C-alpha cells in the first residue's frame, strides 16, 4: 500500500534518526521539537504497563471467572486465548504506539477512514473510567473504616433480622439467635412455619448486610430513580480523583515515577496475604476447589468467550492505555521484551490472586461450617466487599492490619489502572490540541470524571455500573478490537506492518506473529463475537432483570460507542474528496502524509527503507502462475520475501 503526498528523502545511517541519541545513563530524551516527552527510562514504561495490566481484574475478577467456567480447566482456554489473541493484540498495540509516537486516535493516519475506531475506544474508556472510580471510592471507604478498633462489618445491628455476626467467636450464638428470629418472623396467626421447611428464609452475614445497608444503601428497584449520592462515598470518590490527578498532572514525568510503587507494592501485600491465607484452616480445600478442573466445560463456547473477555479486561487491550504508554518510548526501545514480560506476569499474577483468594474463601467456608464453597463465593463487587471482609474479620490475629493491607492494595491496583485510562483520554486531547497544557487538561478531565462517578455512589449505583460495564465497556471494546486489527493488518496490510516493525526493531517478524495477526486472532475474535451476540440474554443485577428503560439505555450506550466507527469514517471521506465517491473511499483507506515515525529524520530513513523493500520484492516476483500464487500467500502472511 503506497503512502500519499510524502516526498522520499535520503536514508540516515542508523535508520532511527535522533531517536537513538541518548545520554550515557540511558535516559530517554524527547524528540526534536519537544513535541513529545519520553519516559525517564525504560523501566518506568515497563512498570507503568504492569500497573495497568496487573489490576483489580487479577484479584477479584479472574478467580471468580475461572471458578465459574471450569475451575482449573479454565486455565487451558485462557492460556490458548492468551497466546492467540491476548499477546498478539498487546504486542500490536505496543508496536503501533511506539512506531508513531501518537495516541490511540492519531495512529489512524495509517487508515484514516478507520478514525472512528480510536474515538469509539475513547468513548469506551470514558465509560470504564466513570465506574472504575466508584470502585476506588468503595475501596477507600473500607480502608478508612478498617482503622476502627472493631471492624464495623463484623457484627450485626439490632435492626438486621436473620443476621449472623462475621466474628468467629460470635458465630455459634448469633447463628442460633438468627434462626430464632427468622422462625418467629414466620408466625402467621396461630400457625408457625418451620424454618427448616421454608426455603425463602436465608441467613445473611453481617458483612453482606453492612455492604448492602450501610455502604451502598442498595435499591432493589430503580424504576423511580437511583437516589441521591451518599456523602461518605462522594468524599471517598473526591479523594480518589485528587490522587489520580496528582499522579498524572505532569504526564509521564510524574506517572512514571509513581509506577514503581503502583506496580511493586501490590505484590508485596499479595505475598503477605498469600503467606497468611495458606496457613488458615480450610485453605487447602479452597485452593483445590479453585484449581480442580471440570473438563466438560472445555466444550462450552461460553467458557471460551469468558476467557477472551477476561483476557481483554486484564491486559487492557483495545482501550488505549497500551498505545498511549508506548507512544512515549524511544523509537528503538526493546518493546518485544516488555510485551512478553507484562503478558506473562499478568497471567502468573492472576493465578497467584486466585490461589490467595480461594484460600481465604476456603477458611470462610470452614468457619461457617459450609461444605460447598460455592455458597460463600460471590462475583464482582460482592466478592471484594462482602466475601473478603467477611473472611478477614475471622482472622484471629489483628484482622484490622490485614484489612488495611488488603484494601490499600486494592486501592493501589485501582489507581494504577485508572491512571492509565485517564492518561489515555488526556493524551488524545493533547494530541489534538497541542497548545493546551497537559496539567490543565488533566484537571478538567478529572473534574468531569468525578462528576460522572457521582451516579455510581447512589443507592442505585450498582445497577448503573452493571449496565455501563456490560454495554459501554465489554461489547464496545470487543467489536472495536476487531476493526482495529482489520484496519492495521487487512487494510494497511500485514506485509507493510511487518516492514515497519523490521525497520523499528531491526529484525524480521516471526511466523507466529504473522499467522496470529493475519488469521487466528481476527477469526477467533469474529467467531466469539458472533456467538456472544447470538446468545446474549437480558441483563440482570442481583438476579433481578433491568426495567425496559434500562435495557434501552444500555443499547443506546452500545450504539453510541460502535457508531463512532462509521460516522467518523463518513466524516473523513466527505472532507477529503478525491474524485468520485468510490475513489474517495479507496483513497481514505490509504495512509495519509502523517503516517510514520514522528521524528522527521527517522521518517526519511523509513521511507527509503520501504522503497528498497518494494524494489526487492518486485525483482523477485516470478512470472509463473505458481510463483505468483506463493507471492500472494507471502504477502498475506506478511512475509518479507
Swiss-Prot record:
Residues 1-38 are cytoplasmic. One of its GO terms (molecular function) is D-amino acid transmembrane transporter activity. It comes from the Eukaryota. GO terms for cellular component: plasma membrane. One of its GO terms (biological process) is D-amino acid transport. Keywords: Amino-acid transport, Glycoprotein, Ion transport, Membrane, Sodium, Sodium transport, Symport, Transmembrane, Transmembrane helix, Transport. Residues 1-21 have a biased composition (Polar residues). Residues 1-37 are annotated as: Disordered. Pfam families: SNF (PF00209). Its main location: membrane. This is Sodium-dependent nutrient amino acid transporter 1. The gene is NAAT1.
